[in-house]
Regions:
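A structural supersecondary motif
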Residues: 147-160, 245-262
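Acidic/histidine-rich catalytic neighborhood of metal-dependent amide-processing enzymes
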Residues: 12-101, 153, 242-245, 249
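A short beta-alpha structural unit
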Residues: 158, 169-172, 205-220, 257-261, ...
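Zn-dependent metallopeptidase/amidohydrolase metal-coordination segment
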Residues: 253-255, 259-269, 324, 328-376
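His/Asp/Glu-rich mid-to-C-terminal helical/loop segments that flank catalytic regions of hydrolases
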Residues: 66, 130-147, 176-179, 225-235, ...
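A conserved active-site cap/scaffold subdomain adjacent to cofactor or substrate pockets
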Residues: 161-244
């Protein structure tokens, strides 16, 4: 990796051309420094190195925890330098599957693109009120059924680790009047979306239409009845904060986010995740989305699930960290309630008496090639 200091964002350290997790990298660096610097004074330490954290916490899941004797843990996959993470969400990842009927229609092909969205981390940014391209697409598809002589051929939203920021569709448009209706719908929705999400900084949401074929040919298009069901599914699946909790009801306790969508060859598929600080709320939400799917004729498959890192009100380690931070910096440390899945949930599920907290340097741009650490 080519490391460099970037002064454009303050004094930061970054790596060129990679989205590898900088938080994982700094955790490795800190542990290796402790292991190879004999002049540092500390009690006996155990170091747990894991693999494939970003792709599914697989290293932590496969580890044999009978090897661990320690019962106090510092995790380094967390927030800013003045912040302590005390818990994190568990999750259920689902795939919805629905078949649909097609009807042949003659017309020219148009492409439609929903873009200009901010996107972001599906955990850390989910409470910021940003738009999700799949949710917007659901509204477009539902209203498309009201356009005469314009039909959906297929649709795609590429897989995203975060909040989807772009969706594409192919449409069959019979004539000029249908094109006019379609463009009016696109203009109306674009204005509506920009207004609805302006407070979240979504000033550039766009719905663009472009003719990609001039010759009118016959295409297999989704039936209006099934298109309504697909639109209802995309809009009915909960997105964003489902329930707040904690002090002053200010902590996102349960959230939902769709991450991938595909309509092709008589099959509609949708990927959706529930994240929750409460196991009971996680499974209650899972039950409700399965009921919605059943009403619309869709099947649901659980692809993966993992437990959260529960919040402890009696953590000696967290109390010690608060005390030391106050003594060192003259201010209270901030508390983070993590919204992205992380390894302590897996570890504490295996070792319930483990007392854990999360500390890390300040970083920005997670899951992007702009990820960087502040070093001054």
């Amino acid at each position: 990796l080519y490391l460099y200091r970037d002064a454009d964002y303050g004094i930061t350290l970054a790596a060129r051309g990679t989205s590898l997790g900088a938080d994982n990298g700094v955790g490795l660096a800190m542990m290796l420094t402790l292991m190879t610097t004999p002049e540092l004074l500390h009690p006996p330490l155990e170091f747990l190195f894991t693999v494939e954290e970003e792709s599914g916490l697989w290293g932590a899941r496969k580890f044999d925890y009978t090897q661990i004797r320690a019962r106090h843990m510092i995790n380094m996959d967390s927030g800013d330098a003045d912040m302590m993470c005390v818990c994190s969400t568990g999750a259920v990842h689902n795939r919805f599957h629905m078949t649909y009927k097609t009807v042949p229609h003659r017309g020219t092909v148009y492409s439609g693109t929903i873009g200009g969205l901010l996107g972001g981390h599906s955990g850390n940014d989910i409470a910021k009120g940003r738009a999700n391209a799949i949710s917007l697409l659901g509204e477009f598809l539902e209203k498309l059924t009201g356009c005469e002589n314009a039909w959906l051929i297929d649709a795609d939203v590429q897989e995203s680790q975060g909040i989807p920021d772009q969706a594409t569709v192919r449409l069959c448009v019979e004539n000029g009047e249908a094109e006019k209706q379609l463009r009016q719908l696109a203009d109306m929705l674009q204005k509506s979306w920009r207004s609805a999400y302006r407070a979240a900084g979504e000033d550039n949401i766009a719905l663009r239409l472009e003719q990609v074929e001039e010759e009118a040919l016959v295409h297999d298009c989704i039936s209006c009845e099934d298109l309504r069901k697909i639109g209802a599914l995309l809009q009915g699946i909960p997105y964003g904060v489902i329930e707040y909790g904690g002090k002053n009801q200010s902590i996102p306790f349960c959230t939902g986010c769709t991450s991938r969508f595909c309509v092709k060859e008589n099959v509609c598929q949708l990927w959706f995740s529930v994240r929750s600080l409460s196991e009971a709320l996680k499974w209650d939400t899972e039950k409700s989305v399965k009921e919605l799917a059943s009403q619309l004729g869709a099947d649901v498959e659980i692809l993966d699930q993992y437990p959260g890192w529960p919040y402890r009100t009696d953590s000696p380690m967290q109390e010690l960290c608060k005390k030391l931070f106050q003594e060192m910096y003259g201010e209270e440390i901030k508390i983070e309630y993590g919204q992205g899945g992380c390894e302590p949930g897996i570890i504490i599920d295996k070792l319930p008496d483990m007392d854990a907290l999360g500390l890390a340097p300040t970083s920005r741009g997670a899951h992007t090639t702009r990820e960087r650490f502040y070093i001054e």
